Amino acid sequence: MKLAIFDYGAGNIFSLRIALEKQGASVDVINNFDAANNYSGLLLPGVGNFDPAIRSIRDYSSTSFSDYVKDKTPVLGICLGMEMFFEKSEEGKEKGLAVMEGEVVLLPNKFKIPHMGWNNIKIKKSNPLLDGVPDSSWVYFVHSYRVKPKNPDIVVADSDYGIDVPAVISKGNLYGTQFHPEKSGKIGSTMLQNFLRECKK
């Protein structure tokens, strides 16, 4: 199976690539969507900043992201990658990918920002990405923003950081994690395995 990681040109995606290859996937790094349909799945990694990442997706592909996801290829957005699914973000001025309704907001300044380190997740509903993942599992976060979906039903797990932070979202062929599964040990590996299984369907 061959997967694609989209490279915004913003930083190191080596750990994500290695984590996927350990699960038996062949991985290419791409910088536009024009050949993305050649892959069984796509990952939007969690490195970079909102505006430059959005521009890299919008400006270097003749195929729009919204048209690409209509193909039903599974897409996993990690941290920033998940945040870009929404319509706008307080981190930047660019419009988001808008494949999900809602916005991205800064964590309240009464909390330590960024939220960095291990925290557990509360599973709200079953989801293919969470098969074999026990409730209250610990995963690794590094983020300063949280998503506010217009439809709360897409949130399948959240995390308590003084406020509820959507930790896992799912809508159709789109999956998102606010945390980094590639840095979350055995639990993260299980989630990546689950994503690969969805890509095989």
Q: Where do the PLM segments sit?
A:
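Pocket-forming structural segment of enzyme catalytic cores
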Residues: 88-163
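Acyltransferase
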Residues: 177-201
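Extreme N-terminal starter segment of soluble prokaryotic enzymes
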Residues: 1-4
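Short, surface-exposed beta-strand/loop micro-motifs that present aromatic residues
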Residues: 163-171
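Short acidic low-complexity segments
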Residues: 27-38
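Cysteine-nucleophile active-site neighborhood
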Residues: 48-117
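Beta-strand-turn-beta hairpins that frame and shape the catalytic cleft
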Residues: 136, 170-174
